[in-house]
Amino acid sequence: RPRAFGEIISRLTAMPPALSPKMVTLFGSPPKDTAFRFTHSSEAIIELSSRIMDWAPEGMKKVYYGLSGSDANETQVKLVRYYNNVLGRPQKKKIISRDRGYHGSGIMTGSLTGLPTFHQHFDLPAEGVKHTVCPHWYRKAPVGMDESAFVSYCADELEKMILAEGPHTVAAFIGEPLMGTGGIIVPPAGYWAAI
């Protein structure tokens, strides 16, 4: 019998048939089979990692699991800092995010978040975090600018910020493909290619 709360098991019966047996098996598995990814592996983790790698760009060979998006973004910041320290570039630590972007609510991830309510009363954003224009054409484009011109405007603003800060100090840019918390904002066509 699976070791899980009865309520959870009863909810599993309402899940699609293909999913529920696997979920019941996971709930009945020892915690090491699902939780301790640094010291143990499991069939479930190997299968999920394989599926993720099927979607990943060529050259990517590893999957890192975090507990949340905030945790994942915090880890990325640490990796950026570590990488530049190892290469002897301790000044290359600045990260550019976007206004209205959401990356978490911790000290660093809250700093990357481009929403003032996440900064108020917490002395955020932290040093080294900058915010560039949000790709919301309807609200952020100068009057009379079409979407194509706005894409160029966003890319130019980012480049100006990098040059103003000093390319030798800017380590990364972070942005969600589709901005959710900041207002369900879909960037105009061509935005990511320009960025």
Show which residues each predicted segment covers.
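Alpha-helix capping and helix-loop boundary segments enriched in small/acidic/polar residues
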Residues: 40, 145, 149, 182-186
